[in-house]
């Protein structure tokens, strides 16, 4: 039996100078003193998010604490990938990284990583639970998703995990794409496991090793359908059920499409399925406008080669009220360090520690420049 004082120390470790400890939903958070009034607002597979006030800036922020970022090499790589991507990206429809910190005092002890971003009012999954949106709102939201995607894709990056809970919206209907932990640069052999199943493109489940940025466009199609109907389009209970639900809407693929599938097992499985005819989207989405239906048909095409790109989808007549090519920026060249490799947890700790240190140096330098400008003016 531990003495009570020892137990208290284990549950609530003594924080480093400038930090304090707070327990939230049975989880111990150790944060800088200038983040106050922490309130839990969400939990996911990879982290927990709290709202907080930043006394330095006088703004409300969201703080994300990663769940066991160094539990495995996969967890560590995911944390690094998201940190690197968010540092490189700068776009109105992509969440901004305001701060990143660890409460641990040296690289050997690093266990926790926290990201800080602007606090948004809600995410799309929250909104879908409480209200139905009119067509103008739907157009504006989908346009902003695609605007962010165009930027992401122009950097040769695939998000791979677009879903309502990864899309934040404020009270002015302004939208930001969240959670880049599964995002990665395109390569010749893309891994099969990504994304929440319900929004996952069929070519990923069909075990193709190579897929393209149009997997994200499929996800946007699923989100658009859900915004229109208020219901998840393909709520599969497992991979097989998911694929069956998709084909009950898109119809059984033809031989031309099947030839593109590299997995012989997947091809044979599909050939042995009962023939399904394509559903009439006008009946399936009876409440949608003809323009919305046309865009849905294009984005939810079973053949990824026949889906539009994010840029092409933005140019669709359904989004004509918002499309403005002069205000749809693409990314500058990004140094994502995507070739960084580490074989041990300790090596990943060193890489992430250095990334956090570099971020904080750049923020401190920017703050100094801002102070100098204020003094000069």
Curated annotation (Swiss-Prot):
Family affiliation: Belongs to the protein kinase superfamily. CMGC Ser/Thr protein kinase family. MAP kinase subfamily.
Phenotype of the disrupted gene, per the record: Knockout causes reduction in adult lifespan. Upon infection by P.aeruginosa or E.faecalis, RNAi-mediated knockdown results in a decrease in survival rate and in a reduced up-regulation of gst-4 and gcs-1 expression. Causes a severe reduction in rnt-1 accumulation in the intestine during oxidative stress mediated by paraquat. Upon exposure to C.cinerea galectin Cgl2, adults show reduced survival and larvae do not develop. Larval development is partially restored in a bre-1, fut-8, gly-13, galt-1 or ger-1 mutant background.
Enzyme Commission number: 2.7.11.24
PROSITE patterns (UniProt xref): MAPK, PROTEIN_KINASE_ATP, PROTEIN_KINASE_DOM
Name listed for the protein in its UniProt record: Mitogen-activated protein kinase pmk-1
Cofactor entry: Mg(2+); Mn(2+)
Motif (TXY): 191-193
One Gene Ontology term, aspect cellular component: cytosol
Protein species of origin: Caenorhabditis elegans
Enzyme class: transferase
PTM comment: Dually phosphorylated on Thr-191 and Tyr-193, probably by sek-1, which activates the enzyme. Increased phosphorylation in response to the heavy metal arsenite. Increased phosphorylation in response to intestinal colonization by probiotic Lactobacillus fermentum strain JDFM216.
Catalytic activity: L-seryl-[protein] + ATP = O-phospho-L-seryl-[protein] + ADP + H(+); L-threonyl-[protein] + ATP = O-phospho-L-threonyl-[protein] + ADP + H(+)
Free-text tissue specificity from the UniProt record: Expressed in intestinal cells.
Cofactor mode of binding and number, as noted: Divalent cations such as magnesium or manganese.
GO biological process, one term: cellular response to metal ion
Domain-level remarks: The TXY motif contains the threonine and tyrosine residues whose phosphorylation activates the MAP kinases.
Lineage of producing organism: Eukaryota, Metazoa, Ecdysozoa, Nematoda, Chromadorea
GO MF terms held by the record: ATP binding; MAP kinase activity; metal ion binding; protein kinase activity; protein serine kinase activity; protein serine/threonine kinase activity; RNA polymerase II-specific DNA-binding transcription factor binding
InterPro entries for this protein: Kinase-like_dom_sf, MAP_kinase, MAP_kinase_CS, MAPK_p38-like, Prot_kinase_dom, Protein_kinase_ATP_BS
SMART domains for this protein: S_TKc
Keyword terms, alphabetized: ATP-binding, Kinase, Magnesium, Manganese, Metal-binding, Nucleotide-binding, Nucleus, Phosphoprotein, Serine/threonine-protein kinase, Stress response, Transferase
Residue positions binding ATP: 41-49, 64
Summary of activators and inhibitors of this protein: Activated by phosphorylation on threonine and tyrosine. Inhibited by pyridinyl-imidazole related compounds.
């Amino acid at each position: 039996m531990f003495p009570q004082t020892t137990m208290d120390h284990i549950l609530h470790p003594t924080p480093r100078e400038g930090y304090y400890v707070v327990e939230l939903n049975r989880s111990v958070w150790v944060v800088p003193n200038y983040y106050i009034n922490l309130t839990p607002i969400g939990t996911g597979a990879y982290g927990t998010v709290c709202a907080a006030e930043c006394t330095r800036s006088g703004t409300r922020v969201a703080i994300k604490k990663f769940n066991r970022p160094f539990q495995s090499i996969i967890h560590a790589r995911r944390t690094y990938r998201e940190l690197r991507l968010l540092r490189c990206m700068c776009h109105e429809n992509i969440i901004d990284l305001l701060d990143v910190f660890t409460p641990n005092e040296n690289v050997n002890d690093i266990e926790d990583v926290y990201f800080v971003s602007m606090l948004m009012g809600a995410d799309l999954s929250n909104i879908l639970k409480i209200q139905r949106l009119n067509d103008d709102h739907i157009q504006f939201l989908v346009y902003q998703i695609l605007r962010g995607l165009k930027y992401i894709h122009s950097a040769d990056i695939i998000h791979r995990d677009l879903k309502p809970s990864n899309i934040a919206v404020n009270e002015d209907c302004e939208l930001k794409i969240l959670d880049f932990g599964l995002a990665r640069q395109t390569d010749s052999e893309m891994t099969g496991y990504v994304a929440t199943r319900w929004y996952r493109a069929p070519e990923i489940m069909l075990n193709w090793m190579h897929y393209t940025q149009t997997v994200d466009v499929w996800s946007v199609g699923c989100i658009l359908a859900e915004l229109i109907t208020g219901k998840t389009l393909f709520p599969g209970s497992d991979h097989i059920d998911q694929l069956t639900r998709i084909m009950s809407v898109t119809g059984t693929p033809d031989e031309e499409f099947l030839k593109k599938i590299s997995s012989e097992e997947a091809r044979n499985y599909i050939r042995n399925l009962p023939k399904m005819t394509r559903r009439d989207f006008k009946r399936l989405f009876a409440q949608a406008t003809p323009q919305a239906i046309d865009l849905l048909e294009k984005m939810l095409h079973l053949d990824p080669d026949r889906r539009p790109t994010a840029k092409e989808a933005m140019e669709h007549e359904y989004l004509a009220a918002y499309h403005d090519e002069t205000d749809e920026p693409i990314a500058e060249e990004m140094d994502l360090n995507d070739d960084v490799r580490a074989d041990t947890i300790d090596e990943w700790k060193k890489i992430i520690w250095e990334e956090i240190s570099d971020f904080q140096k750049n923020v401190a330098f920017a703050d100094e420049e801002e102070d100098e400008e204020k003094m000069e003016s």
